Regions:
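C-terminal regulatory tails of eukaryotic serine/threonine kinases
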Residues: 5-19, 231, 248-314
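Conserved catalytic-loop aspartate of Hanks-type protein kinases
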Residues: 180
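Intrinsically disordered, low-complexity regulatory segments that flank or precede the catalytic domain
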Residues: 1-41, 313-318
Length: 318
């Protein structure tokens, strides 16, 4: 009897799998169970994060089902491509377009934050257009690093993607929702000039720039960008998370809600810089910030030791 019931369940799984595969409305990532702890995945991804989310700018998880070998996540099917790819392909692109994009993303992140969810890995590769239509909405995807935040708790696990990670994460301090707002500041900066505010081939130098909040609005790339846009970015890229704008403050900024964004075409400059700067693998890879910071500590300890040794040698010579 158990074998018959098992066979029926497997047939149902196969039927459901084929049904979803043939659906135009949904996509279905599948994962081998050896790579996933099924119970944790269902509890964490479905119930604690994606299972509670319903927003027009967030890819929705509709259901989870499994068979003996695989776990299936039934999600929205988005076919419009990645954010930067679409911008590069456009014939016209303005500051107002960037403002509209950021407004949609802010609305979604504000919704997540109100539900106690921190994305923790906001970056252009996780921002997808819903359809190829010119007026398609933007969607937030990839909640692999997302975490729910209790009212009285702060997170401490260092994670993210190097160029978008907030200073408090690199300092290995407890952090909260403000890390998403920092990442949005980085994304907004890139949308308006085509290159990142913080960059260096050396991780140590990159992290040092971020922790100091060291960036510029360089000429000529920012000459045609409004002061309102620059002020908006400055409000998000505050090193002190207590001084950083939250989503609601950002949504109320004149550049987002007050019509301050310019409508001059900046496509040529922005798309050229995007093509130059964003085919670099290191900007597309998530990283373990704890391991990275440990490497930096070792480098610092080594440098301090070398300086101490040099100082001792000089003292002996004297």
């Amino acid at each position: 009897m158990e074998e018959v019931e098992s066979a029926r369940n497997e047939d149902a799984d196969e039927e459901r799998s084929n049904e979803v595969k043939n659906s135009r409305r949904k996509r279905m990532p599948l994962f081998g169970k050896k790579k996933f702890d099924e119970k944790i995945t269902k509890k964490y991804v479905f119930h604690e994060v994606l299972g509670t989310v319903d927003h027009p700018n967030i890819i929705r998880l509709w259901e989870i089902f499994d068979n003996k070998t695989h776990l299936y996540l039934v999600m929205d099917l988005v076919k419009g491509g990645e954010l930067f790819d679409r911008i590069v392909e456009k014939g016209n692109y303005t500051e107002k377009d960037a403002s509209d994009l950021i407004r949609q993303i802010l609305s979604a992140v504000d919704y997540l934050h109100d539900k106690g969810i921190v994305h923790r890995d906001l970056k252009p590769e996780n921002l997808l257009y819903y359809s190829p239509d010119e007026d398609s909405k933007i969607m937030i995807s990839d909640f692999g690093l997302s975490k729910t935040e209790d009212d009285d708790s702060m997170m401490a696990t260092a994670c993210g993607t190097p160029g978008y990670v907030a200073p408090e994460v690199l300092r290995q301090k407890p952090y909260g929702k403000a890390v998403d707002c920092w990442a949005l500041g980085v994304i907004c900066y890139i949308l308006l000039c085509g290159y990142p505010p913080f960059y260096d081939e050396s991780d140590a130098n990159l992290f040092a720039q971020i922790m100091r909040g060291e960036y510029e609005f360089d000429s000529p790339y920012w000459d045609d960008i409004s002061e309102s846009a620059q002020h908006f970015i400055t409000c998000l890229l505050q090193v002190d998370p207590k001084k950083r704008y939250n989503c609601k403050q950002a949504l109320d900024h004149p550049w987002i809600s007050g019509g301050a964004a310019r409508e001059r075409d900046i496509h040529a400059s922005v798309s050229e810089q995007m093509k130059k700067n964003f085919y670099k693998a290191k900007w597309k890879q998530a990283f373990n910030a704890t391991a990275a910071m440990n490497r930096l500590k070792n480098l610092k300890l080594g440098a301090d030791s070398a300086r101490a040794s040099e100082s001792n040698n000089n003292a002996k010579k004297i």
